[in-house]
């Protein structure tokens, strides 16, 4: 049986546009922390690749997977599968996943100490709309998302994660990088102490 005691999932959460995917990419490129690939029924954005950015599903194929968590967001389904988690842990002991706050709570409940929550926020909400528009989302989709109850929910750190999540305000990318560097360093030290 494989020793799972050292394995950790960095659960990156926050409202859409706070930089969750950018943070996940930074962790991968600077620390070789692979991202758990999740499933969605939303259409691909320009440049996205099936099996790399998401597993792009249809309404018919989505329910055929085994999910640790899944959610409907802005009329599309999103979910992370047990198989995706296992595939990521085959690559590394420290992996990341991008989730909404509801999914982050589920991971924290289901995985306990193996789930390390990172909550991203910004100082001004108009930054979020600008980021959504600049990444190629259609204006109608952006407006739909920022009016959704899920978006409003994800702007705030859930009470269930208070005291458990590390909060990073992602207004200035250089400051965010420094905060992420300190976060990963502390996490690796913690993993090494479990190992010894």
Residue ranges and their predicted role:
Residues 12:
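Hydrophobic anchor at the beta1->P-loop junction of P-loop NTPases
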Residues 15:
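P-loop (Walker A) phosphate-binding loop of NTP-binding proteins
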Residues 18:
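ATP-binding Walker
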Residues 21:
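Walker A/P-loop
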Residues 29-37:
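Post-Walker A helix-loop "phosphate-sensing" segment adjacent to the P-loop in P-loop NTPases
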Residues 40-95, 99:
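ATP-dependent small-molecule kinase phosphotransfer cores
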Residues 96-100, 111-134:
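Conserved phosphate-donor/acceptor-positioning beta-strand/loop module used by diverse small-molecule
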Residues 137-184, 194-196:
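Small-molecule kinase domains that catalyze NTP-dependent phosphoryl transfer to phosphate-bearing small molecules
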């Amino acid at each position: 049986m494989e020793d799972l005691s050292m394995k950790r999932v960095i659960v990156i959460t926050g409202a859409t546009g706070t930089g969750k995917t950018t943070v996940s990419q930074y962790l991968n490129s600077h620390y070789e922390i692979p991202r758990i690939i999740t499933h969605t029924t939303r259409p691909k954005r320009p440049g996205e690749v099936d099996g790399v950015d998401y597993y792009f599903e249809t309404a018919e194929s989505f329910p055929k997977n085994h999910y640790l968590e899944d959610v409907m967001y802005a009329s599309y389904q999103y979910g992370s599968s047990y198989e995706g988690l296992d595939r990521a842990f085959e690559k590394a002991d420290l992996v990341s996943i991008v989730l909404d706050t509801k999914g982050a709570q589920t991971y924290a409940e289901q995985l306990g100490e193996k789930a390390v929550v990172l909550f991203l926020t910004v100082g001004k909400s108009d930054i979020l709309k600008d980021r959504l528009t600049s990444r190629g989302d259609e204006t109608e989709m952006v407006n739909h998302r920022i009016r959704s109850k899920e978006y409003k929910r994800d702007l705030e750190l859930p009470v269930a994660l208070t005291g458990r999540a590390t909060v990073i305000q992602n207004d200035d990318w250089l400051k965010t990088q420094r905060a992420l560097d300190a976060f990963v360093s502390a996490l690796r030290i913690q993993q090494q102490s479990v190992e010894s």
